[in-house]
């Protein structure tokens, strides 16, 4: 189901059973896999690939350009695995040329309200980040980190 107020680029790839709520914006080069739910007022942009069964809560900003002053517009990526939950006001930036061009989140993670994952981070499976926790660029979190 896609809400009529959602703005979705014809160049994005949306799989079956994806729910996109009111006032969401899905830009070109975004790929969203099956059974993901994007509740409302979420912006997903950049070269962002989202796996299956993820849930994005309102006012999340996913894939916008890095907050790295060295970033000069290079085409970097954000890759998100399966079964993750992104609560309200989560922000995630793609990679930069100084860190391999990829920010990656594996599976079964919980990002509580106001979390920020900066450029070139690598988040393994089963990670929990509590309210307003932030990661600077180039941070790696191993499995089961809370």
Residue ranges and their predicted role:
Residues 2-146:
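Structural signal for interior beta-strand "rungs" in well-ordered beta-sheet cores
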């Amino acid at each position: 189901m896609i809400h009529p107020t959602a703005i979705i680029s014809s160049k994005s790839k949306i799989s079956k059973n994806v729910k996109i709520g009111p006032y969401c914006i899905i830009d070109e080069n975004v790929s969203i896999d099956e059974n993901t739910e994007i509740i409302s007022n979420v912006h997903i942009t950049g070269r962002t690939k989202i796996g299956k069964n993820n849930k994005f809560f309102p006012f999340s900003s996913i894939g916008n350009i890095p907050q790295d002053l060295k970033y000069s517009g290079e085409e970097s990526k954000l890759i998100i695995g399966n079964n993750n939950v992104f609560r309200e006001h989560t922000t995630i930036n793609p990679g930069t040329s100084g860190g391999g061009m990829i920010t990656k989140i594996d599976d079964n993670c919980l990002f509580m309200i106001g979390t920020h994952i900066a450029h070139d981070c690598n988040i393994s499976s089963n990670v929990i980040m509590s309210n307003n926790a932030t990661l600077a660029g180039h941070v790696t979190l191993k499995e089961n980190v809370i």
